[in-house]
Amino acid sequence: MRKILVTGGAGFIGSAVVRHIIRNTQDSVVNLDKLTYAGNLESLTDIADNPRYAFEQVDICDRAELDRVFAQHRPDAVMHLAAESHVDRSIGSAGEFIQTNIVGTFNLLEAARAYRQQMPSEKHEAFRFHHISTDEVYGDLSGTDDLFTETAPYAPSSPYSASKASSDHLVRAWLRTYGLPTIVTNCSNNYGPYHFPEKLIPLMILNALDGKPLPVYGDGMQIRDWLFVEDHARALYQVVTEGVVGETYNIGGHNEKANIEVVKTICALLEELAPEKPAGVARYEDLITFVQDRPGHDARYAVDTAKIRRDLGWQPLETFESGLRKTVQWYLDNKTRRQNA
């Protein structure tokens, strides 16, 4: 049985990872999270009292606290998800992204390296540092049907993706220079329960239920590949336990959809699942409002997942249709939680 330190474990993807490990394995989890606006411990209520779960409210930029957590809990692996992740916020406030995503990752790498140096030899060799990143580091696939592979060159477009690209490079450098056994994964857009409502899918669901406009950037034809968060959590655990040191694995759902198609699909699901609409709303689709496009908006992201499917045998269990239906139903069934999401 392993003990895994999960940074950002109160966030959307991190909490799915924590829930997956506690519910489906015998491993223990130390959840390290600063609890920013997007962190939500309610997403972990069901497992919070499990004896294999512990929580530490710590900022990854605080090196002294990181050293304390490593010394106290003595993890066998790190799954690093703590990050500022919203592109729009990065455009207006890039400094927070530089600090958390780059400086914070540096601090965590150094704390992990110092900790590993004093581990017993058998645990020293088995230790893993799994860095969870994004397909946005690869840039844009406009005008092509190609997919990003793990060897695609980096071409980040936003302060967010540039900060994640920087952290990816740090992680690989700590393997090359110091021998820290690192693995990197790059994922496509995630969706599912407990998502903070600044992101596209939860924002559309919650705005529609409140009778508010559904803002769609530009013409809505930007294409994203969508991955159900629980499928991603399974993949991440499989990578940290079975992945090869020094390798990168792309994780995606192979569900390429234009943003406007996603919004219209949500509207259609709500017509079926929530037919009693807010006052003054005849059809949910009538709420769609096209707004000025985001600066530097990438036209298309999509990743090739052949490597993780071939090498680790992972594949998603949810289609976009089944996953989106589960997501919409969750928000309908969890009114109080969705208000606090």
Swiss-Prot record:
Q: What is its EC number?
A: 4.2.1.46
Cofactor: how bound: Binds 1 NAD(+) per subunit.
Q: What class of enzyme is it?
A: lyase
Reaction catalyzed = dTDP-alpha-D-glucose = dTDP-4-dehydro-6-deoxy-alpha-D-glucose + H2O
Organism name: Neisseria meningitidis serogroup A / serotype 4A (strain DSM 15465 / Z2491)
- Kindly list the biological process annotations in GO that this record carries: dTDP-rhamnose biosynthetic process; lipopolysaccharide biosynthetic process; O antigen biosynthetic process; polysaccharide biosynthetic process
Q: Which pathway?
A: Carbohydrate biosynthesis; dTDP-L-rhamnose biosynthesis; Bacterial outer membrane biogenesis; LPS O-antigen biosynthesis
Q: Which Pfam families match?
A: GDP_Man_Dehyd
Q: Where does substrate bind?
A: 85, 134, 189, 199-200, 215-217, 224, 259, 293-297
Protein name listed in UniProt: dTDP-glucose 4,6-dehydratase
Active-site residues (renumbered): 135-136, 160
